[in-house]
Design a protein with these regions (language model features):
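Thiamine diphosphate
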Residues: 1-79
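Conformationally flexible catalytic loops at phosphate/diphosphate-handling active centers
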Residues: 5, 49, 159-201
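Short gly/pro/ser/thr-enriched loop/turn and capping motifs at secondary-structure boundaries
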Residues: 35, 56-59, 82-84, 107-112, ...
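Short beta-strand segments
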Residues: 76-78, 99-106, 127, 137, ...
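Conserved thiamine diphosphate
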Residues: 119-166
C-alpha cells in the first residue's frame, strides 16, 4: 500500500467516526496541508461542506451553524497561523457551550522547529478553551491504526457534545504528497461495525 492509499484510508476512517457521532456539517478554510481532509470531507455525502477562505469568519460561521442545529460542526484549516484565526470563535464557543470540532493540519514532526514555512507550535494552542486536545498519529493503514483513527473521530465529536458542550481540537501532522485517492474504495464500514453499540465516552 502506497502513501496516498494509506493516508486516504486513515483519514476516511476518521471521518466515518465523525459522521457516526453526529457530524453533519463542516466549514473548510482550504490550504495546502489540509487538502486531504478537505477533499475527503467533501466526498462524504452525509456531511454538508462549506468553504470560507477567511478563517476568522469561517469559525464564527461554524459557531452559528452549531448553535442553530445543536449538533457538532467541524472546522478545518491548514497549518501555521491559519489556526490562530479560529481563537476568538473558539473562546466564544467554550463560554457558550457550543460543540465545535476543530481540525488543524500540521507539518510532520521532522519539519517542526527547523524553520520550515507555515510551521508554528500548534500543540495545545487553544489551551483551556477546548475540553479535549488530541495530537493525531501520522497516518498508517494497519487495522489497529484505522480503528484508532475512527475512534478519535467518534470520540472527538462525542466529547464536544457531552454536557457541558464545548469545542475540541484535533491536530493532524501530514506528510507530502497531500492529494488523497478519491477513487479508492475504503473499508471504513468495518470500523463502524466493530464499534457499533460501544460507549464512546
Amino acid at each position: 500500500m502506497n502513501h496516498q492509499e494509506t493516508m486516504t484510508d486513515y483519514l476516511t476512517a476518521f471521518i466515518e467516526g465523525l459522521k457516526n457521532s453526529g457530524v453533519e456539517q463542516a466549514v473548510i478554510s482550504p490550504g495546502s496541508r489540509s487538502t486531504p481532509l478537505a477533499l475527503l470531507l467533501h466526498r462524504e455525502t452525509a456531511i454538508q461542506t462549506f468553504v470560507d477562505v477567511d478563517e476568522r469568519s469561517a469559525a464564527f460561521f461554524a459557531l452559528g451553524l452549531s448553535k442553530a442545529s445543536q449538533k457538532p460542526v467541524v472546522l478545518l484549516c491548514t497549518s501555521g497561523t491559519a489556526a490562530a484565526n479560529y481563537y476568538p470563535a473558539i473562546c466564544e464557543a467554550n463560554i457558550s457551550h457550543v460543540p465545535l470540532v476543530v481540525l488543524t493540519t500540521d507539518r510532520p514532526h521532522e519539519l517542526r522547529q527547523v524553520g520550515a514555512p507555515q510551521a508554528m507550535e500548534q500543540l495545545q494552542m487553544y489551551q483551556n478553551h477546548v475540553k479535549l486536545f488530541v495530537e493525531m498519529a501520522l497516518p498508517e493503514a494497519t487495522e489497529e491504526m484505522l480503528n484508532y483513527a475512527y475512534w478519535q473521530g467518534a470520540k472527538g465529536a462525542a466529547f464536544a457534545q457531552q454536557t457541558p458542550a464545548a469545542p475540541v481540537h484535533l491536530n493532524f501532522p501530514l506528510r507530502e504528497p497531500l492529494l488523497p485517492d478519491l477513487e479508492r474504495k475504503t473499508k471504513s464500514s468495518q470500523q463502524t461495525a466493530l464499534f457499533a453499540g460501544q460507549s464512546i465516552l
